[in-house]
Amino acid sequence: MPVFHDQQRDALRRMYLEAWQRHQEGMPLTPLQAQVADVVALHPEYHALLTPDALDRDWKPEQGQTNPFLHMGMHLALREQVSTDRPKGIRDVHVVLTRRHDSAHEAEHRMMEPLGAALWDAQRQGVAPDEQRYLAALRSL
């Protein structure tokens, strides 16, 4: 794996650790740190993993492991998409799913599989994600 990728991954993971630590210590947070801390707070199963040792750890989906940083990052990505309503209509889908599941957090969990599939397809094909196909998958939930 390229060194640049490892440095980016470590910096991103360090941001989660720092935001959570600042939140726990009651220190002021930037808006991004507050968003990160909010997502971390919703995932107590990951709290013990937010240590410097996690910076280098790999989670292997083929072994049934969930990468907590990827999972929480998808929450942040979905929240950004909903806040900007991009793709157009995703906010409405989120509202419907939130009502159906009585939880915005659960709605985001339902939306993760279509998001992951859209990103995977785009990466595999070397193109931008197909927003309309992604939105159609979300609407079918």
Show where each model-derived region lies.
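N-terminal leader/targeting peptides and immediately adjacent processing regions
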Residues: M1-E45
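Non-catalytic terminal/accessory segments
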Residues: P68, L78, V82, G116-L119, ...
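Well-ordered alpha/beta subsegment
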Residues: H109-E113
